[in-house]
């Protein structure tokens, strides 16, 4: 039998890495500290628990980089994408999932695999021998982070990440709010009505911004300094950047028509997305926050339609850690100072559930191939996975390295016409090229 692969962390990346390696015939020991050791953000001991939102973002694999990443992971028979499909919720053109059954099914599949053993323990030190993948995510334990600092001599970088609140659907006033996906996107009626929309006129919007700016915020610990990831900014931080920022961000009113008052154009719109299959819970889209709990309920109840809302969960903020991967990792995602250890997921400086799982998929395949005596190069940079791994292992500037979502700016340029129509053609050219390159890489 092949040597064993140890994986630390059973989040998106660790779960996918374990599945890929085991499917290649390599025995896996999956180390997960939860539920024995908890974190600020996690509620359960389930694997692949979704703590920020329940969305894998756009599922458009022809003109969207994250949708292309979905396609590549499906082509590679990824467990995360398979389970996401099994627990998919209507969300217009996005891929949203029922988060608890999703995590339960990922956990069950991994625990049932004959080549995967699960050990519920905290790994506090970087091991000096054996084959390891560290996929501890943004909430890496302080002991392991300290071990990493001691080995590399480098400070782990950090940024703050916020979580959006969840509302009980039955407490939303549907005489004010209405159901509609932006631009009526979706092939079914469920998809076209996947979001609940709460309209604001100008006076309501201005009062909301005033309250948001004045609300009491969570204070950070003394000496704790870090930036925010731009893709997950707290709404009050966005409001501080300008009073109109939210109107052009998560509260933009475009592509929506109030079914109660079709002739009336909203000045701003707050959207809520279904958070579970039953449709009993909705999260407020883009409303991650660091306001204190009392302030949250007061401010969010100013939203028309949410005056009597009850919250299943309020928002919160936590500190994320990630490596300066361009300095520390090679192109096989191995730690240069200790090549028996690979890193995967958000700890490497990718941002997002899908990106994390994709890096887990690659790390799992690369580690398994190495154990089996083969060398597996990363996918070409023309692919979504290849573009991401190239970025984190050397494509990014080490001095200014920050967490990154997948986007077409990471891909080698392609010649195409300019303008709006040209941009759509260019994105399609990116995805066509990527699919061909990824298919060839998979078959090699």
Curated annotation (Swiss-Prot):
InterPro entries in UniProt: FAD/NAD-bd_sf (IPR036188), MnmG-rel (IPR002218), MnmG-rel_CS (IPR020595), MnmG_N (IPR040131), TrmFO (IPR004417)
Cytoplasm keyword on record: yes
Residues the record lists as binding FAD: 9-14
Signal peptide stretch: none
Localization, UniProt: Cytoplasm
Cofactor annotation: FAD
Function per UniProt: Catalyzes the folate-dependent formation of 5-methyl-uridine at position 54 (M-5-U54) in all tRNAs.
Protein name as annotated: Methylenetetrahydrofolate--tRNA-(uracil-5-)-methyltransferase TrmFO
Organism: Cereibacter sphaeroides (strain ATCC 17029 / ATH 2.4.9) (Rhodobacter sphaeroides)
Gene that this polypeptide is encoded by: trmFO
């Amino acid at each position: 039998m092949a040597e064993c692969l140890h994986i630390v962390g059973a989040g998106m990346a660790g779960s996918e890495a374990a599945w890929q390696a085991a499917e290649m015939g390599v025995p896996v020991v999956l180390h997960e500290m939860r539920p024995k050791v908890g974190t600020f953000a996690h509620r359960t001991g389930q694997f692949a628990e979704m703590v920020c939102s329940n969305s894998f973002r756009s599922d458009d694999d022809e003109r969207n980089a994250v949708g292309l990443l979905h396609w590549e992971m499906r082509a590679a028979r990824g467990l995360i994408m398979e389970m996401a499909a099994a627990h998919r919720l209507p969300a217009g053109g996005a891929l949203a999932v029922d988060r608890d059954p999703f995590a339960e099914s990922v956990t069950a599949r991994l625990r049932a695999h004959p080549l995967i053993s699960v050990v519920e323990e905290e790994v506090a030190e970087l091991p000096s021998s054996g084959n390891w993948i560290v996929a501890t995510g943004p909430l890496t334990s302080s002991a392991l982070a300290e071990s990493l600092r001691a080995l590399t001599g480098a400070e782990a970088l950090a940024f703050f990440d916020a979580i959006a609140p969840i509302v009980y659907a039955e407490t939303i006033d549907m005489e004010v709010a209405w159901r509609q996906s932006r631009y009526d996107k979706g092939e079914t009626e469920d998809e076209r009505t996947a979001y609940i929309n709460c309209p604001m006129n100008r006076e309501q919007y201005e009062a909301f911004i005033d309250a948001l700016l004045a609300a009491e915020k969570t204070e950070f610990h003394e000496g704790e300094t870090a930036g925010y990831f731009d893709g997950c900014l707290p709404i009050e931080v966005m409001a501080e950047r300008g009073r109109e920022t939210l109107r052009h961000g998560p509260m933009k009113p475009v592509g929506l028509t109030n079914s109660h008052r079709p002739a009336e154009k909203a000045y701003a719109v707050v959207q809520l997305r279904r958070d579970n299959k039953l449709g009993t819970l909705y999260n407020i889209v883009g409303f991650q926050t660091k306001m204190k709990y009392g302030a949250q309920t007061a401010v969010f109840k100013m939203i028309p339609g949410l005056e009597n809302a009850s919250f299943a969960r309020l928002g919160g903020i936590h500190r994320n850690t990630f490596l300066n991967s361009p300095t520390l990792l090679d192109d096989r995602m191995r730690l240069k100072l200790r090549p028996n250890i690979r890193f995967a997921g958000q700890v490497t400086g990718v941002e997002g559930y899908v990106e994390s799982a994709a890096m887990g998929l690659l790390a799992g395949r690369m580690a398994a191939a190495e154990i089996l005596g083969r060398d597996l190069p990363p996918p070409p940079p023309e692919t979504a996975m290849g573009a991401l791994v190239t970025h984190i292992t050397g494509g990014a500037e080490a001095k200014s390295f920050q967490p990154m979502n997948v986007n077409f700016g990471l891909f080698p340029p392609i010649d195409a016409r300019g303008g709006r129509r040209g941009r759509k053609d260019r994105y399609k050219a990116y995805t066509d090229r990527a699919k061909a390159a990824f298919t060839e890489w998979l078959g090699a």
